[in-house]
Amino acid sequence: MALELLSPAGSPEALRAAVQSGCGAVYLGWGSFNARRSAKNFSDEEFADAIRYCHLRGVRVFLTLNTLLTDRELPLALDAARTACRLGVDSVLVQDWGLFALLREALPDLPLHASTQMSVFTAGGANEVYGDGCERVVIARECSREDTAAICKACPAEIEIFGHGALCMCYSGQCEMSALIGGRSGNRGTCAQPCRLPYGFNGPAKNTYPLSLKDSCLADRISDMERMDVSCLKLEGRMKRPEYVAVITDIYARLLREGRKPTAAEKADLELAFSRSGFTADYWQGRHGPAMFGTRPENTPEPKELFAAARAKYEKDDARTVPIHFSCSCQAGQPVSLTVWDDDGHVAAAEGPIPEPAQNKALTATDLEFRLQKTGGTAFRCTDGSADVADGLFLSAGAVNALRRDALAALENARCAVPVRREQDFSPLPNLDCTADTPTLTVSVTTWAQAEALLPLAPARIDLPLELLAERDALPDFAGEWCAILPRVWRDRNEPQLRTWLAHAKKLGVTSALAGNIGHLPLLRDAGLTIRGDFGLNVFNSRSLDYLRRKELSSACLSFELRFPQMRDIQKLIPAEAIVYGRLPLMITENCLVQNETGCHLSEAGDAVPQQAPCRKPNDLQDRTGAKFPLLPAYGHRTEIQNSTPVWLADKPEWKHCGLTYARLRFTTEAPAECADIFRAYQTGAPASGPFTRGLYYRGVD
């Protein structure tokens, strides 16, 4: 299958720019449930017109419904998908597990694409969503050429990659920085882009931007994608100007069409259209580091000449035409007939009046062919045609024009015909109730010293990183449950090591594991451990819990973007958990922020982070207000950024009345004795003794 070029359409004008510049498909937002709610997006009428405009010109339309949804919003999102399906949309991109399951049942013939917000970066994850009905998977921007090739080889789904545009610092779908700092959720389409602000490393914020990545540009790596059977190359930019969309689409379309790399002039135009101190292709090449980062000054001038030329081209609306062919018969005593067809198998026909005997000059085949070839003002371009005209006949110019107009209108309708798709009722949620009267306290730790300090207090469960468990030959005596925390991010090449560690953990007496990614599930099924869903799965509604129940999870942690009433109203189809104490994770990043500052090379020795690594020492980022965000090392020499202050709810009653089975205390930077004190405070309901936040449990997110 040829590599599809997918362009952003943040507005009707941007859509026209993309189509006229040569894209194969567009993705757009309609309604409130898309990950770029700040884009202009489309009204109801504009959305219907957009689908017809695109389909007429052979361009597919993908609707983004890729945000997390509450129980109250799910029916509205389903209605939007039903309407889009009836209008002929070609696919819907989804993030929310509940909406995914709902759409697959209610609209079984509607193609679904797994949005990059599903955080898929392994073949196991891709196969999980493919097996549940996603025909295409948009993999993480951080995937390298080798990662992508492994996924393409091992998964039958179509694989889509980001080829050009902005790079988020955090793995998409896992970023909570905008939500927790300002209440604007990236998972709900309102990210405030705090990654573009200045931060200081272990000191006050200066004019440094350690979270601001350059835009990606893979224009000269297209042949790589084609060799490994990538299905779609996606251009990012629904928030950008239509002229920007036109420029980048035109260049990438040319490269695909001509099978070549970009010229120096084309690279310059891409950079002129928009860049942040240049471009990067480091993720694709399996690299990371300081060279990937850049900024764009606010006073950067607009490329007026480049944009004016692009605008002039797409405003003519005639660059993208459909080649057609015709055959006409004009015989005495019979209505004149015209058949037109395109190269995609669509055929249409029209009839005109019976030709009259010629009084003066008779109609010739050459004359009729010349008139029928005039398709100006339409989306069609006649490449060839023939007319069979009997001698001595006359047909008025008006009749010929009407005949051509009717035939082209019929062909347009054929090209824009809406496919017949089934619409079904969806099943009610099962009559299950795992609501608990009072939650039991569980703990997660990052060090053995923390775990040992908590053992005498008898939490119901202790969650430890799998890497820590791999270091031990035996576990301390503990009446509760030992639970392994799998790395939040890993790659297919890491799975042999993870499987070895899981087998070792099971021998030690570990009985369960936290799955924070859909790709964890095949690993944990094979390991024979009880699977508990972690916060990375973004459980936001009852249908998501039901989806995970059917995936045989024994419990799941609810999203910490939910307010307590929303948490309470979720039907507990499996035991539910919430994080009620701790520094909440803001980001998980492919770049090691400490390595970028110190020049450490320990990543060359393997993916496990050694104890002597500089990232094991206390490090933080400091913003302009003086808030300090601790940096913790993550498997694969990645970084997890923690919130500046911990959530404290020991003195609040609401979390005890949400039907939760488990309430988790998440320990990260705390000293062992501090962990024990905090656990006791939650047993007694004590107030906080230091700075704290209530998280989003009261204020919620936009």
Language-model-derived ranges and their functions:
Residues 1-21, 25-36, 50-51, 57-67, ...:
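Surface-exposed amphipathic alpha-helical tracts and adjacent flexible/coil segments at the periphery
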Residues 39:
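A short acidic, glycine-rich active-site loop
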Residues 90-91, 99, 108-112, 120-124:
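N-terminal glycine-rich cofactor-binding segment that shapes the pocket for flavin-like pterin cofactors
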